């Protein structure tokens, strides 16, 4: 039934190439605001043309390709509708992974990724986001995504975790500890094409107080184990204070890609053990 409905919808709305870009982007990020789609799918358009295109999203929603709802004071947020999921499945050969109930969480990640893309574009670099982990991660060890940054001939990978303050500190720590299992399995060497395990960036929307509690919770789990995991902790407010990479000449090229977003960020090299006690 949905396949037949999809054929009717494609004909009725005259599906455009940019519409397809929007659907595939939503499959990747799960949920996005119009401002995110402006950067991710309309960067080649003038402002007026981008505004006109974004008005088309309402038509795609009416056709069942998208779903949308008003999100606080930030306007409409969009995700794939049932018909849109069928279209994506036909294009990529598998159904998109649904992550229901994570609207705030996913929008935090989208905010970060859009900021990363803008920062890299400003200095001639490139930022990419990977979030499909079914083939290489188990359910307990999957990060929220990987930021791949290319600048000055170098590529750096960062595992990214988002914290909206809804989980207990112990839950966050256990999730991060799960990476030790993934590290020991070794598949990451083929995935990243490197013998250097990526550092992890934990972003919290909970403010400075939450950041301090997370830092203490992580430090309480330090053990003398074989797996070194480098962590950077920051807040959404700190990330909003973007410092241009070009103004940080004292940093080497491998560090410049990310540290411009992390002024005054707490950086630790933590060996995360497998203790079970609560933080």
PLM features: residue spans?
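Active-site metal-binding core of divalent-cation-utilizing nuclease and nuclease-like domains
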Residues: 69, 102, 114-158, 164-178
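A short, highly charged nucleic-acid-interacting micro-segment common to nuclease
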Residues: 27, 93-110
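Acidic-and-aromatic substrate-binding clefts and catalytic sites of carbohydrate-active enzymes
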Residues: 45-47, 136-138, 208-209
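A general structural detector for well-ordered alpha-helical segments in enzyme core domains, enriched
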Residues: 56, 175-179, 214
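Hydrophobic/basic alpha-helical segments enriched in Actinobacteria
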Residues: 111-113, 117-139, 205, 221-240
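Nuclease-adjacent, charged terminal/linker segments that flank catalytic cores
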Residues: 1-91, 95-96, 277-279
């Amino acid at each position: 039934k949905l396949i037949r409905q999809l054929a009717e919808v494609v004909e009725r709305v005259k599906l455009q190439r940019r519409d397809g870009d929007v659907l595939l982007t939503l499959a990747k990020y799960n949920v996005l605001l119009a401002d995110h789609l402006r950067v991710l799918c309309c960067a080649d358009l003038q402002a007026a043309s981008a505004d006109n295109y974004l008005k088309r999203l309402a038509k795609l929603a009416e056709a069942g390709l998208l779903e949308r709802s008003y999100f606080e004071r930030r306007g409409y947020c969009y995700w794939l509708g049932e018909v849109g999921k069928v279209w994506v499945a036909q294009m990529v050969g598998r159904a998109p992974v649904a992550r229901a109930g994570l609207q705030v969480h996913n929008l935090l990640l989208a905010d970060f990724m859009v900021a990363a893309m803008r920062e890299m574009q400003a200095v001639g670099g490139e930022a990419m986001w990977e979030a499909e982990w079914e083939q290489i991660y188990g359910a307990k060890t999957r990060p929220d995504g990987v930021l791949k940054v290319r600048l000055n001939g170098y590529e750096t990978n960062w595992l990214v975790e988002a914290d909206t303050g809804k989980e207990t500190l112990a839950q966050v720590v256990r999730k991060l500890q799960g990476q030790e299992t993934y590290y020991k399995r070794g598949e990451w060497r083929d995935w990243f094409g490197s013998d250097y395990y990526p550092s992890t960036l934990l972003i919290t929307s909970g403010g400075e107080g939450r950041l301090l509690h997370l830092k203490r919770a992580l430090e309480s789990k330090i053990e003398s184990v074989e797996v070194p995991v480098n962590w950077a902790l920051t807040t959404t407010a700190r990330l909003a204070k973007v410092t241009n990479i070009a103004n940080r000449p004292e940093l080497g090229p491998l560090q410049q890609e990310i540290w411009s977003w992390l002024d005054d960020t707490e950086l630790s090299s933590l060996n995360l053990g497998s203790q079970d006690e609560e933080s």
